[in-house]
Regions:
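Conserved GNAT acetyl-CoA-binding A-motif
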Residues: 113-126
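Acetyl-CoA-dependent GNAT
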Residues: 5-88, 93, 106-108, 112, ...
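Conserved active-site tyrosine of GNAT-family acetyltransferases
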Residues: 138, 143
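Internal catalytic or translocation cores that form aromatic/hydrophobic pockets or channels
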Residues: 144-148, 155-157
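Conserved beta-strand-loop-alpha-helix junction that forms the acyl-donor binding cleft
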Residues: 94, 123-134, 152-156
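Residues forming the Rossmann-fold NAD(P)(H) cofactor-binding site
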Residues: 99, 103, 107
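Active-site acidic-Proline motif in GNAT/NAT acetyltransferases
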Residues: 93-95, 99
């Protein structure tokens, strides 16, 4: 049985200056670079996460302990009526794996997408075995495989996934893979 999820507050962190946030993102990038060829690493660094189209969020306990991070990037996608977002930089702190924190972060990102009227949220993750838990996690949360979106190109090291944003004004069916 998994431990009960800790009491968590998920909030927007616009400056990305906290040492623990930087360390978790650096570990995330190091893992991505260790398991994927350079041309297939699509994780964003700190500077890229400061893009105005990106809303970066943190999950913390009441005492301020960092449990995870994630971001929502609003895409300029004229083919998606109602708007399109991308989940980026989802990472759970090692001490919070399998506690429900990732689900809480993802729910917060989907709520942000809904509040902004986005119809669809997509993501890119790896095809390597290292990423199998991530693919299962996203599938449990309603994501299905799709083709490349936004600026992505077909890549044998990438898996693209998408889902409609429930409750948005326009939430069409998933595009074909």
């Amino acid at each position: 049985m998994s431990p009960a999820p800790p009491p968590v507050t998920v909030s927007v962190d616009p400056d990305l200056t906290a040492r623990d946030v930087r360390a978790l993102l650096e570990a995330h990038l190091a893992d991505m670079r260790a398991v994927s060829p350079p041309e297939s690493v699509h994780a964003l660094d700190l500077d890229e996460l400061r893009d105005p189209a990106i809303t970066f969020c943190v999950a913390r306990t009441a005492d301020g302990t960092l449990l995870g991070v994630g971001a929502l990037k609003e895409l300029d996608d004229p083919t998606e009526p109602g708007g399109h977002g991308e989940v980026k930089s989802m990472r759970t702190a090692p001490t919070a794996v399998r506690t429900g924190v990732a689900s809480q972060l993802l729910a917060h990102l989907l709520d942000l997408a809904r509040s902004r009227g986005l119809a669809r949220v997509s993501l890119e993750t790896g095809a390597e075995p290292f990423f199998a838990p991530a693919r299962r996690f996203y599938a449990r949360h309603g994501f299905v495989e799709c083709g490349p979106f936004a600026d992505y190109a077909p890549d044998p090291n990438s898996v693209f996934m998408t889902r409609p944003v429930a409750g948005s004004a326009a939430a069409p069916a998933a595009p074909p893979a």
